[in-house]
Amino acid sequence: MMRVLVVEDNALLRHHLKVQLQDSGHQVDAAEDAREADYYLNEHLPDIAIVDLGLPDEDGLSLIRRWRSSDVSLPVLVLTAREGWQDKVEVLSSGADDYVTKPFHIEEVMARMQALMRRNSGLASQVINIPPFQVDLSRRELSVNEEVIKLTAFEYTIMETLIRNNGKVVSKDSLMLQLYPDAELRESHTIDVLMGRLRKKIQAQYPHDVITTVRGQGYLFELR
């Protein structure tokens, strides 16, 4: 399963991509413009982005260049109607990793996504290490003092997000969106229950409270 960011201004195509990707088991954030794409990029930490070039507020190539200049390293797959070789060179030169020309079959998009993730897995670290905490991204495991802590899928998602944002407050709404993409399933007290369980499991291996509730803002992971 991947978290996919789809950036497409055409509402029908955006919805089609989102549904097809979700049906394949992926989590999907769908943005209609560059501003919304920036929000999802920073809040939800996607594994890969699918970007259309014709966005209403910023050209797709400009968006990709801006991401790359800010050291955003996630794989980017471009959707384009431009078929000339010069256009394809420009797409790849912008910092995109691959492209699909319109019209396309969703199977081709899926195949290119998987290829990019395989290629990227050899380049990016699969472990986040903040001693004595360690997150194995490929195994989806949290270890403390080299002991694996058994977490549910929701608990792991919360811990990975907090540790990725070490020292930064993560909003409650952001966590809720990651756990429950469907708004009808969200209940704010669920996060509080999960946090309580997480703290107990962690304190069995590490005596200090590393998850702080920041009133009115969210949650903070920080070693003391």
From Swiss-Prot:
Location in the cell: Cytoplasm
Residues with PTM 4-aspartylphosphate: D52
Taxonomic superkingdom: Bacteria
GO molecular function: DNA-binding transcription activator activity; phosphorelay response regulator activity; transcription cis-regulatory region binding
Domain Response regulatory residues, every copy: 3-117
Entry GO CC: cytosol; protein-DNA complex
Chief subcellular location: cytoplasm
PTM annotation: Phosphorylated and dephosphorylated by PhoQ.
Entry keyword set: Activator, Cytoplasm, DNA-binding, Growth regulation, Phosphoprotein, Repressor, Transcription, Transcription regulation, Two-component regulatory system, Virulence
Disulfide bonds: none
Record InterPro entries: CheY-like_superfamily (IPR011006), OmpR/PhoB-type_DNA-bd (IPR001867), Sig_transdc_resp-reg_receiver (IPR001789), WalR-like (IPR039420), WH-like_DNA-bd_sf (IPR036388)
GO biological process, one term: regulation of DNA-templated transcription
Mutant phenotype after disruption: Decreases survival in macrophages. Decreases tolerance to acid stress. Abnormal expression of genes encoding virulence proteins. Decreases fitness in the spleen and liver of mouse. 10,000-fold reduction in virulence in male BALB/c mice (for strain ATCC 14028). Double knockout with phoQ decreases virulence in mouse.
Induction remarks: The phoP/phoQ operon is positively autoregulated by both PhoP and PhoQ in a Mg(2+)-dependent manner. Repressed by RcsB via sigma factor RpoS. Induced by acidic pH and by low magnesium.
DNA-binding region, residues: 125-223
Transmembrane region(s): none
Function: Member of the two-component regulatory system PhoP/PhoQ which regulates the expression of genes involved in virulence, adaptation to acidic and low Mg(2+) environments and resistance to host defense antimicrobial peptides. Essential for intramacrophage survival of S.typhimurium. In low periplasmic Mg(2+), PhoQ phosphorylates PhoP, resulting in the expression of PhoP-activated genes (PAG) and repression of PhoP-repressed genes (PRG). In high periplasmic Mg(2+), PhoQ dephosphorylates phospho-PhoP, resulting in the repression of PAG and may lead to expression of some PRG.
Alphabetized PANTHER family for the sequence: REGULATOR OF RPOS, TRANSCRIPTIONAL REGULATORY PROTEIN PHOP
Subunit details: Monomer in the inactive, unphosphorylated state and dimer in the active, phosphorylated state.
Miscellaneous comment text of the record: PhoP/PhoQ-signaling cascade, which activates virulence membrane proteins (PagC, PagO, PagD, PagK, PgtE and PhoN), is induced by cationic antimicrobial peptides (CAMP) (polymyxin, alpha-helical peptide C18G and sheet peptide protegrin-1) at sublethal concentrations.
Protein name per the record: Virulence transcriptional regulatory protein PhoP
Gene that produces this protein: phoP
